[in-house]
């Protein structure tokens, strides 16, 4: 779940809505549903907050390997509360200062800025609809340029999750 948020800029409700049957198509993952907790009830919805949130990303090979290891259809079959507590525990076990799960989307945006990903592509990847959050996407992106952007971001994260061995 953490890599889906930090690497692909998915929110907790988007991560919880991912399924192998509806979200995965070949080497792409698409936000088709979200899962939210309303009181004590869990609700699966066909759409995120806005149409721009229903977006598609190429699945980085490292994340694809993790997805392939998941039993069943639902990629993250736990409640929002359980996910939150596991995230806090992971931070504690690794001596990290606490950040919220949502902060991982901010991290994703910051990493894209650090890598000098054009705002237009960063906004598309993050699913932000207005320039008050990022910048508006009015023009279509070119798939060749988008592929270059995806390669830059994938390369950055792959170096983190698969560090080169010394010697």
Predicted feature locations:
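Active-site-proximal segment of tyrosine recombinases
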Residues: 14-16, 99-100, 109, 116-128
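Short, cationic motifs built from Arg/Lys/His that form the positively charged side of catalytic pockets
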Residues: 10-13, 55, 105
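Short, charged phosphate-coordinating catalytic segments
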Residues: 3-33, 120
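C-terminal secondary-structure termini that scaffold catalytic or DNA-interacting sites
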Residues: 39, 44-62, 151-167
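Short, polar N-cap/turn motifs at the start of nucleic acid-interacting alpha helices
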Residues: 23-28, 117-137
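Short helix-to-turn junction characteristic of helix-turn-helix DNA-binding domains
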Residues: 1, 5, 112-113
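Catalytic-site neighborhood detector that most strongly recognizes the C-terminal catalytic loop/helix
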Residues: 35, 64, 126-151
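Active-site/catalytic core of tyrosine-dependent DNA strand-transfer enzymes
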Residues: 33, 58-97
């Amino acid at each position: 779940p953490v890599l889906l948020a930090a690497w692909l800029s998915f929110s907790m409700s988007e991560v919880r809505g991912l399924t192998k049957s509806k979200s995965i198509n070949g080497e792409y993952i698409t936000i088709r549903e979200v899962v939210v907790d309303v009181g004590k009830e869990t609700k699966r919805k066909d759409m995120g907050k806005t149409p721009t949130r229903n977006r598609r990303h190429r699945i980085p090979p490292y994340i694809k390997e993790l997805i392939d290891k998941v039993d069943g259809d639902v990629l993250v079959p736990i409640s929002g509360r359980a996910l939150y507590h596991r995230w806090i525990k992971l931070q504690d076990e690794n001596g990290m200062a606490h950040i919220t799960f949502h902060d991982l989307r901010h991290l994703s945006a910051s990493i894209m800025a650090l890598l000098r990903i054009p705002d237009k592509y960063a906004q598309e990847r993050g699913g932000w609809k207005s320039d008050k959050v990022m910048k508006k996407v009015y023009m279509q992106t070119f798939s060749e340029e988008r592929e270059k952007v995806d390669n830059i971001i994938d390369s950055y994260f792959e170096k983190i999750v698969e560090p080169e061995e010394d010697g």
